[in-house]
Amino acid sequence: MKKISVTCERKEDIALLKEAGADEVIVALEGGVFSSLQTFSIAQIAELLTQARLVQVQLFVLMNRLFPQSEIKHAQQELKQLLEIGVDGVIIADPGLYQVAKGLSLEDKLIYSPETLVTSAEDAKFWLSTGMYSVNISPLLTEEEILKIASSVRHCGIQVFGYLLMSISKRPLLTAYQEVANIEEPLHHNHHLYLREQKRDGMMPAYENEAGMMIYTDFVQESFAWLEPFSNAGIQRFEMYGNYIPQNALFDAIRMYRRVLDGEDGESVRKEFVLKYPELPVSDGYYGQKTIR
């Protein structure tokens, strides 16, 4: 079954996401993510899980930080709590969390998603051989490279919509800039900051939390015309990230992606979306570009 998995930042949106066509919702763990998404405590996630069960949608937790030695024990304990309350899965990037799930015989609840690091079939096969549920392919690859991995390895996923996380620094660079430039407005946990390169017009969302600073692409990844070949090659999970996306555009994108997966022509649906949301800097990203090695 091909599943659409969408980020969720409000409890009241769970039912709406299900109605729009989402099979899974992704919620971010407080203190556990490299992401600008709204985060939730484990107690809050338990409440979200109850709501998800009511509307019959699966709930996955994003926990994609890399944890230093001083924090890994606490992170492992949080993962244990999440698995014990019954979430459908946890999306991780730190291999140090794997042993906890294995000790509970719940390694099949993990999705390995190290942002841009899964770039070959060998990578994906290795992580799936550990018993994990799924592996996310890097979205910064060409169509040819993605199809090669997907056709060789089952149970893969990929981000197909939203701004892509491009850069992470554990240093609080925005806070440092605020101090040097004597800026009064708080830059920490500020969702309204963008970077622009001197010779480019694109605006890159920038965000800082306790884990560090993150920079996103200056384009919104869209994959309307690519859903059919990706699906035919074997990709099973299609992730859609809604941070920095207007809610109406995100919900329309979900509905339109569902239409494509149900058989409509992807290019025609893409044109419909672009016509409706001309202000969004949508792009097919790196699908048609040669990866530099």
Task: Report residues per predicted region.
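Active-site pocket-lining/capping segments in soluble small-molecule metabolic enzymes
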Residues: 1-116, 136, 143-293
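Conserved nucleotide-cofactor-binding alpha/beta core module
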Residues: 120-122
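As written
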Residues: 131-132
